[in-house]
């Protein structure tokens, strides 16, 4: 996130942390170069557009502790980081609930052009009532209705990206004074339940046309959405839970005519790696000392919509009243052998990364655990959560990456081409994807 802390809250107080420099171009340029040196596929930027104000019914804790606030726009970082790298992809979170499809599609096409095909979009529908109020609405749509609206948004975006301009529309013929052939640019007319448009798209086709699509919905409706639209999907929980989720989403995607090879699943985790196990555990203890349990629980309150400050710290949470809380408690209860959860235990769990289990140890130990996740959970990769910046990433690049490369389980060099080509071997979405039905064809003209 374009702020001082996103999930492992409070670590901005660590004396070696440089996240206060998030306001500078130097910070992001150095981070991008470090990740490319380590062969990372993508730098992922989460985002919110409202305040975490559920804890105690106000945003005070989030403001005091820097819980995703203040936060700057993530999209504007991409051209800067693309300029100092050649291969690193950039996944940017944008909440479609408050976007105009026509203008948003142009912004993403622009990023894809400027990055030479390295743009990705993490599709979210939002969870903060404060975001709805900030956008002039009294409240959010209901959970499933937000996904219904997102489906309509995607249909229009696909029409713009995939169906308005033919690949050979731009000829740039100086002698004939023809830059774009009008017969190769097609009007988009969309009359959906939430969005309407009558336009030709503003941007010529970018290297990927549609950016690589990320998504993280864990509900049944969210998994249906992922099965239809997403290419890269975030999962969480234990290995068994992640494997079950992956199998479920894959089955839904296959039912829509897609394949497992069309999908990449990433599990979120915190990695603390040292030259030895003792060094890593000492560093992990140091991180926990600087972390803020209250900040973590303020964040979790916003995610679930439940103000945990109202509860007795030692009273068991027996009847979770939101799906988000129910899913979280099922996840952590399985990991803890069925122990009862209280707000006090949640406070401890929230210190570093909430539902994301830290992996702590030497490079060999961490590599063993990552390989275990791939083997047992069927994940394709990892969404590594920052802790103390920049050392959390330089440690991974300098200690863990060489170990993974020595084992032959991590690339030694990048494959040339777009981000989608690096991940899937093709620049454009396959014909099996929902977007393909919106491509221009002479028969439909």
Predicted features along the sequence, with ranges:
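N-terminal glycine-rich cofactor-binding segment that shapes the pocket for flavin-like pterin cofactors
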Residues: 1-445
């Amino acid at each position: 996130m374009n702020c001082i802390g996103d999930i492992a809250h409070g670590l901005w107080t660590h004396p070696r942390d440089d996240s206060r420099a998030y306001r500078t171009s130097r910070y992001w340029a150095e981070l991008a170069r470090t990740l490319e040196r380590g062969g990372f596929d993508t730098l992922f930027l989460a985002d919110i557009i409202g305040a975490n104000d559920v804890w105690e019914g106000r945003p005070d804790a989030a403001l005091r502790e820097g819980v995703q606030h203040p936060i700057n726009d993530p999209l504007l970082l991409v051209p800067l980081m693309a300029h100092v790298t050649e291969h690193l992809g950039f996944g940017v979170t944008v909440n479609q609930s408050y976007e105009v499809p026509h203008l948003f599609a142009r912004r993403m096409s622009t990023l894809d052009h400027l990055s030479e095909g390295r743009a990705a979009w993490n599709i979210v529908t939002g969870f903060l009532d404060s975001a709805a109020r900030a956008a002039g609405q009294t409240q959010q749509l209901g959970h499933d209705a937000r996904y219904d609206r997102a489906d309509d948004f995607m249909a229009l975006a696909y029409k713009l990206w995939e169906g308005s301009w033919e690949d050979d529309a731009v000829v740039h013929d100086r002698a004939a004074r023809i830059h774009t052939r009008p017969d190769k640019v097609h009007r988009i007319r969309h009359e959906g339940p939430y969005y309407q448009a009558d336009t030709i798209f503003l941007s010529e086709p970018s290297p990927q046309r549609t950016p690589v699509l990320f998504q993280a919905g864990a509900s049944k409706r969210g998994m249906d959405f992922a099965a239809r639209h997403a290419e890269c999907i975030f999962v969480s929980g234990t290995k068994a839970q992640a494997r079950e989720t992956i199998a479920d989403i894959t089955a839904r995607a296959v039912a829509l005519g897609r394949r497992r090879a069309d999908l990449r699943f990433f599990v979120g985790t915190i990695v603390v790696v040292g030259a030895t196990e003792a060094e890593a555990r000492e560093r992990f203890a140091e991180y926990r000392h600087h972390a803020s349990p209250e900040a973590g629980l303020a964040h979790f309150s916003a995610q679930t919509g439940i103000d945990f400050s109202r509860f007795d710290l030692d009273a068991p949470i027996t009847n979770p009243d939101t799906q988000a809380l129910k899913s979280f408690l099922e996840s952590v209860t399985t990991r803890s052998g069925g122990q009862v959860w209280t707000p006090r235990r949640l406070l401890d769990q929230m210190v570093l990364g909430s539902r994301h289990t830290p992996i702590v140890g030497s490079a060999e130990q961490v590599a063993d655990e990552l390989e275990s996740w791939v083997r047992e959970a069927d994940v394709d990769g990892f969404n590594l959560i920052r802790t103390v910046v920049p050392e959390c990433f330089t440690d991974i690049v300098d200690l863990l990456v060489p170990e993974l490369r020595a084992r032959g389980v991590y690339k030694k060099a990048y494959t040339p081409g777009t981000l989608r080509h690096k991940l899937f071997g093709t620049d454009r979405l396959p014909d099996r994807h929902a977007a393909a039905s919106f491509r221009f064809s002479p028969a439909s003209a």
